[in-house]
Amino acid sequence: MSATQNYGTGRRKTATARVFLRPGTGNISINNRSLDNFFGRETARMVVRQPLELTETVEKFDIYVTVIGGGVSGQAGAIRHGITRALMDYDETLRSALRKAGFVTRDAREVERKKVGLRKARKRPQYSKR
């Protein structure tokens, strides 16, 4: 891998994102589509931009992302985590600010499995006393 490129892997729920930071003008490409084209929701676009806005590097990098698995929210979170890791690979001094904002820690919440005899993970059939 060349020195002009920084890499970070991000995960959230079942989504995994591979993020490449290259010096550029601020283009964000996700699975060969633009950020606005890939995410319909403004909240998802905002989540992806958060680490860049915090570190004031929005116009400094072109970001290339491949993301698989999960849904819209999980993919946005995975991309944010990947961008955070790539930024720390680029400049370790950004770590404290990113950690304070809560972007460094991987969100470990996963879907709870469905149990036998229950309708969902915790939803039980109606109880009849008599």
From Swiss-Prot:
Keywords: Ribonucleoprotein, Ribosomal protein. InterPro entries: Ribosomal_Su5_D2-typ_SF (IPR020568), Ribosomal_uS9 (IPR000754), Ribosomal_uS9_bac/plastid (IPR023035), Ribosomal_uS9_CS (IPR020574), Ribsml_uS5_D2-typ_fold_subgr (IPR014721). GO terms for molecular function: RNA binding; structural constituent of ribosome. GO terms for cellular component: cytosolic small ribosomal subunit. PROSITE patterns: RIBOSOMAL_S9. GO terms for biological process: translation. NCBIfam families: PRK00132.1. Belongs to the universal ribosomal protein uS9 family. This is Small ribosomal subunit protein uS9. It comes from Pseudomonas fluorescens (strain ATCC BAA-477 / NRRL B-23932 / Pf-5). The lineage of its organism: Bacteria, Pseudomonadati, Pseudomonadota, Gammaproteobacteria, Pseudomonadales.
